[in-house]
């Protein structure tokens, strides 16, 4: 930086070497402690290999809506699960900390439901009133991508395949 200017914040995900990871995986990113001692953890739920594949928005959007319910049922302290702009996965935020193995198992169970059991009735918030882009959903694409991700296996480690 030039003299007199503040240092720019470091964005962790921009520091990750995306050429070294082996998707699909769950990666623990960081834990933040708030002013009252509350702990929030951030996880990288990477579903596809960066710079090789990206999930089309309709499928990703449907996965997002569906796992919003499914992961809440499986992960205590679930706060939010938001898609990456690159469409290769999600950030998961939780109160407290969880092992990557537990998060990977919860993700696997959720994707199994999407791939093999979900019907349109299982996808929440798909109306104009409840969704900001309700026309951009595809249960077919969500199911096909979930099957592919499950076939590849979800690892609890981003660099070494430890499939759960």
Curated annotation (Swiss-Prot):
One of its GO terms (biological process) is quorum sensing. Its cofactor is Fe cation. Gene3D superfamilies: S-ribosylhomocysteinase (LuxS) (3.30.1360.80). It comes from the Bacteria. It is an enzyme of class 4 (lyase). It catalyses: S-(5-deoxy-D-ribos-5-yl)-L-homocysteine = (S)-4,5-dihydroxypentane-2,3-dione + L-homocysteine. Fe cation binds at residues 61, 65, 131. GO terms for molecular function: iron ion binding; S-ribosylhomocysteine lyase activity. Involved in the synthesis of autoinducer 2 (AI-2) which is secreted by bacteria and is used to communicate both the cell density and the metabolic potential of the environment. The regulation of gene expression in response to changes in cell density is called quorum sensing. Catalyzes the transformation of S-ribosylhomocysteine (RHC) to homocysteine (HC) and 4,5-dihydroxy-2,3-pentadione (DPD). Homodimer. This is S-ribosylhomocysteine lyase. It comes from Bifidobacterium longum subsp. infantis (strain ATCC 15697 / DSM 20088 / JCM 1222 / NCTC 11817 / S12).
